[in-house]
């Protein structure tokens, strides 16, 4: 599988030179796993069962995804790397090329094309192998492990930035269609419990207010005319 991963990553810049590989063999099954991260955004995961390419994935592929996510998160937590960021499975798999191949005595193939492995025990077997061996590899290759975590953190930050941009765009379109004044300098927070709206008199007052505000939680709305002191009026 190491040669296969090397072939799949031809033309790409690897994040680490060493291709990670594990294997295990029992009387009932055989498991091989190979992993390598690259400086690209795409994800490549290939899985095989009894030399059949399981195009629709299956339990062995689920075990690979789950265990890799756990191992990287555990390593990052142990080394106190980017503790302020929660790495998702998608963050961790970005740039990853992973291959898992299993052999089972009685394979159960599912799906429309019968290319999905359904043997439930293979998920836990693949997980056990990776959960045992991958942390050992990361401990022995801390430089490569840190590089992988850094790569995952970049993916996480990009995901969060994209989410924030979508929320701001959505919020802006809601404000534009709700009839609210166009001069509203909105805040970035979407939590109403911490957000504040300051109404000021005219554009001249709005300028200094915008400069002095906390743009994360404070919005500024300039309006025309004198603002009535409601307390005095009542």
Residue ranges of predicted features:
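GHKL-family ATPase ATP-binding module
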Residues: 1-234
């Amino acid at each position: 599988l190491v040669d296969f991963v090397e072939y799949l990553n031809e033309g790409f810049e690897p994040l680490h030179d060493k291709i990670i590989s594990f294997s295990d063999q029992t009387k009932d099954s055989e498991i091989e796993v190979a992993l390598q991260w690259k400086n690209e955004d795409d994800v490549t995961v290939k899985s095989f069962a009894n030399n059949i390419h399981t195009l629709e994935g299956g339990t062995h592929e689920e075990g690979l995804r789950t265990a890799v996510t756990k191992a990287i998160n555990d390593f990052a937590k142990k080394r106190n790397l980017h503790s302020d960021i929660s790495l998702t499975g998608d963050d961790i798999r970005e740039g990853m090329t992973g291959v898992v191949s299993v052999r089972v005595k009685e394979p159960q193939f599912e799906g429309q094309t019968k290319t999905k492995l359904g043997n439930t025990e293979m998920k836990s077997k693949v997980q056990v192998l990776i959960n045992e061996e991958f942390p050992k590899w990361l401990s022995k290759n801390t430089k490569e492990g840190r590089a992988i975590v850094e790569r995952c953190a970049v993916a996480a930050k990009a995901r969060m930035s994209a989410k924030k941009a979508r929320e701001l765009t959505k919020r802006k379109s809601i404000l534009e269609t709700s009839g609210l004044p166009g001069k509203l300098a909105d805040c970035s927070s979407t939590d109403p419990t911490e957000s504040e709206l300051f109404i000021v008199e005219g554009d001249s007052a709005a300028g200094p207010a915008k400069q002095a505000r906390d743009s994360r939680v404070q919005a500024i709305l300039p309006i025309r005319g004198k603002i009535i002191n409601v307390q005095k009026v009542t």
